[in-house]
Curated annotation (Swiss-Prot):
The lineage of its organism: Eukaryota, Metazoa, Chordata, Craniata, Vertebrata. Glycans are attached at residue 166. Residues 29-50, 108-128, 208-234, 288-316 are cytoplasmic. Gustducin-coupled receptor implicated in the perception of bitter compounds in the oral cavity and the gastrointestinal tract. Signals through PLCB2 and the calcium-regulated cation channel TRPM5. Coiled coil: none annotated. InterPro entries: GPCR_Rhodpsn_7TM, TAS2R. Its main location: membrane. This is Taste receptor type 2 member 3. Residues 1-7, 72-86, 150-186, 256-266 are extracellular. Several bitter taste receptors are expressed in a single taste receptor cell. GO terms for molecular function: bitter taste receptor activity; G protein-coupled receptor activity; taste receptor activity. GO terms for biological process: detection of chemical stimulus involved in sensory perception of bitter taste.
Length: 316
């Protein structure tokens, strides 16, 4: 039944889908154009471009999933179609999350300043460390996707047993096992979350100490460099906040099958996920000078907060 909640959900989904494709498509087109013209691309821009491209795929997958939730919810957890969506979603989403982690580590090693020997060793080898992380992320994404095979086998056994009489207890146990496997699939995301959290917190700690020192020794408390570091801290905090909200959406989607209002929980999880894919990509534009300058030039009126002269944490 198509009600008020489904109507609002559909409007939000379509709006976020269009905005997400525009924002991420802008990142891909601008960076690809510079790459084609100069025949080279920095590691950070390569990661950002790859991330935007994978987010476009994610937006399409989530949009298709949203249409199934609204118009054919009874078939949402069944059939080959949903298994294909699960496979593409798992790989694309897992690799996208690791791309965020790689970008976080890269910014941390490039911007943060600590005197610890281990940190300095990693800082001098930042590019090699991040490239190694990218290969590891690709491998882990493949492994996490292959782990779905066991979940599909359980679901297949569950489907076959429905047509067999006197199998109530077996069906109940298999359903519990299937739901548990689905929830445990989120454990693959924990390592990338920890890596990103550590990188973000180190960045905030380093920028906070640096800003404090500059305010202490600077005659003018509104020193341009201090203001730049404050802006960087706000941007990093925004990244962290969006990232935590994205993981919250996973928890909602995974636990939805254990809640009385399963459909509502899934709707909330989908809206949060798509909001993240739009909002976080916009922050990527704001904190990247090349993307920001092009974006501001395309605006019909000049925005004070996005003037080309204002610098983010990344100058690449």
């Amino acid at each position: 039944m198509f009600g008020f909640i489904e109507g609002v959900f559909l409007v939000l989904t379509i709006t976020e889908f269009i905005l997400g494709n525009l924002v991420n498509g802008f990142i891909v087109s601008i960076n690809s154009s510079y790459w084609f013209k100069s025949k080279k691309i920095s590691l950070s821009n390569f990661i950002i471009t790859s991330l935007a491209l994978f987010r476009i795929f994610l937006l399409w997958i989530i949009f298709i999933d949203s249409l199934i939730i609204v118009f054919s919810y009874q078939t949402h957890d069944s059939g080959i179609m949903m298994q294909l969506i699960d496979v593409f979603w798992t790989f694309t989403n897992h690799f996208s999350i690791w791309l965020i982690s790689c970008l976080s580590v890269f910014y941390c090693l490039k911007i943060a300043s600590f005197s610890h020997p281990s940190f300095l060793w990693l800082k001098w080898r930042a590019s090699r460390v991040v490239v190694g992380m990218l290969w590891g992320a690709l491998l882990l994404s493949c492994v996490s996707t292959m782990s779905l095979m066991n979940e599909f086998k359980i679901y297949s056994a569950l489907t076959r047993s429905k047509d067999t009489p006197n199998m109530t207890e077996y069906i109940r146990l298999k359903r519990q096992e299937y739901n548990l496997m689905h929830v445990l699939g989120n454990l693959w995301k924990i390592p990338s979350l920890i890596v990103s959290l550590v990188a973000y917190l180190l960045l905030l700690l380093s920028l906070g100490k640096h800003t404090q020192q500059m305010q202490q020794y600077s005659i003018d408390s509104r020193d341009q460099s201090a203001e730049a570091h404050k802006r960087a801290m706000r941007i990093i905090s925004s990244f962290l906040l969006f990232f935590l909200f994205y993981f919250l959406s996973f928890m909602i989607l995974s636990s939805s099958r254990f809640l009385p209002e399963t459909r509502i929980a899934r709707i909330i999880g989908v809206v949060i996920s798509m909001s993240y894919l739009v909002g976080d990509s916009f922050i990527l534009i704001v904190c990247n000078n090349k993307l920001k300058h092009t974006f501001v030039a395309m605006l019909p009126c000049e925005c004070g907060h996005l003037k080309p002269g204002s610098k983010g944490p990344s100058a690449s």
